[in-house]
From Swiss-Prot:
One Gene Ontology CC term in the entry: host cell nucleus
Function description: subunit of the RNA-dependent RNA polymerase which is responsible for replication and transcription of virus RNA segments. The transcription of viral mRNAs occurs by a unique mechanism called cap-snatching. 5' methylated caps of cellular mRNAs are cleaved after 10-13 nucleotides by PA. In turn, these short capped RNAs are used as primers by PB1 for transcription of viral mRNAs. During virus replication, PB1 initiates RNA synthesis and copy vRNA into complementary RNA (cRNA) which in turn serves as a template for the production of more vRNAs.
Basic and acidic residues bias locations: 56-65
Subunit structure: RNA polymerase is composed of three subunits: PA, PB1 and PB2.
Protein name (database record): Polymerase acidic protein
Biased composition annotated in UniProt, kind: Acidic residues: 119-129
Species for this entry: Quaranfil virus (isolate QrfV/Tick/Afghanistan/EG_T_377/1968) (QRFV)
Superkingdom per UniProt: Viruses
Compartments where found: Virion; Host nucleus
Amino acid sequence: MAFEAYRLLIANPQLYEPDFVSQAGELSEHWARENWKRREESLRHDKVCMLLMNTEPRERSHTQAEGEEEGSSSRSLATEEGEKRFSLEALEGLVDQGREVLLENLEMEEAQANSDSEGPNEADSGGEGEEFVFGVESESEMEVASEVTKLLEPDLIDSNFRYTLLEGVTSGKFAQMEFTALWGINTNNKWDLVDRVNRKLIEVKVTTRPPTGVWEEVVAHAEGTDPEHNGAYIIHDDLCGNFTPYKFGNISDLPGWPSAQDFPIRRHAFLASYGGVPSAGGIEEGLPAWDDVFMERTRNWVAPLWKKGPISVRRDDCPRMEPFNITKFITLLEDPRLRNTDKSAKWKGKILPVSWCRTIISSQEKDIDMVQEVIRDLGVIGLWEEINANPVKVERTVSALSELMRLFQEGFREKNPYISVKRKCKGWVITGHKQTPALTDTLLELGVGYKPYQMSNVVEEDMRQCETDDIEKMKWVDWMSKLAATESEPLGSKVSRDDIFKEAESRHVLDEPAKKMCSKVYDLYRSHKIGATCSKFMGFYSRMGGSYLRAIAGNSRQHSSLAIMPLYYKTYQEDGTSTRHLTGLVIRGPHHVRESTDTINLLIVEKTCLSRREAQERLSGGALVNGVWWVRKNAIRKADPTYLAFLHNSLFVPTNFLGELVTTPKHFLRQRQPRILGRNPVWQLWLL
């Protein structure tokens, strides 16, 4: 809201006409990179310059009729015949007179060149370093008819006006070049107004600083410009609605000041009504980039650093840091089991571990067939109760699940596991179904149509991020230890294929015993429930990432639709047969993720073996449906499948450690054998 008042000023047609804003503002090169405050201040300057000029006509020119009134303010008021009413003989005479002046000047230049070649002569040259320029010095040496000057003068922006506007005009730069070339004025600056009677280049300023100081800066900035041909019209703003003009450089009063004074007064009133506060420091302040006193002190402070001198080592008597003691560090750690709080940690994983799930044995191979088996086992959604969640939100989630099950079952008849979602003028709808409040609420549960507004660059009051508190400490509970124990239970079969841990061929002499040790670790992983949990995670994230990649490659365009997929892990028997163990299903919302942190919304349904009390103790934010089905919403990031689809690679750390035991036995056994192998006698058997 800091610049909103200035945006309203620009949009106010009582201050700035739309055409003026377009020509002087939007079409300018600086408009796109400035904020609203600087844009409005630039328009204010152009508007003041425009009001100060074009109010006083010049003296009658040779193109005006003799009977035309002297007070005519514009050449456009005269008729076309009146503008052309002049004598052709008089014009030819003026041209001949100009040609004679030019020939005389050329003769003078040749004579001066001859005198310079013969030798400097102070009497002939007219003074050392004196140069002749046509149109400037010639006026002092011979009289040139004023009609010639008027004839050569450029006809720019109503030539019958005394003042010509340069600021904010597309051709202003070229107009200034024409005037300065005609009058013989050298300048490197861009000016705001031109007084065509007194041949003055005028700078206009609206400032809150003392006018005298501003004029000194204008003079310094205009170094190289003839002081007789420049001046400044400085308007002082006291920030209270009063504006006082000051003239510098012997310029005439600008007759447009009454109109120009009314404009900033009205602008000040509108700014106050919009809640803006007039402040100093605008674009015309032109504050110096540095202060001489400050820079001098800075140079004096830095100067000793460059002087060479004796180097003396500073004595440091500070106490030294003690070596890190892991035993002492552990004693400083807080025991989470002893925290005095009623809140305990809950399971935050996207899907449940295998030891908490009930499985449905299936021989199906296609996802759509496995999903139908899960839906048949789920049956009709009946009783449910919220678990550590808001009952109102949970009710919406369960209702959305029931509606989605009905919609997906309609698609299963055509072997279609997707629900197409499109956006229309009235909102998001499901293809083939009328828009109803129930379907709208169902889509909202998967994030469809949830974003209430589109991102824009407009500053709003509620854009400030909410304050965040420290992470709340929770109490350690026994279910974490129990989970580690249950995940270590044997599975009765093996997950994953034998070639999942296939290693590169090597001929090192110690590779064979190292491979035997790693193979035992792999077998332990594949034959226990932790391996089944990892297999379940890998299958889920592989589908999420693979679906996204196929959509990017163009082979599948279903990433913008609702999709349903099963949750399961696969076991292998000794005879080579395989079995799929279904634990639930996932409904994936439509997504167009681009950044790595963009999310994909999910509705997850899993069959659990936890009792109501255990679910209340361990799970967070969901509903227990029909007593055994755990239902909740969640989301994953775009980058998650990149790593979690290859979760088995986490075994690299322990297997690499075992490889170090084999490849460096002397160092390891000498240093750590009593401490590690003494507590793990089974490892000694492996080393044998």
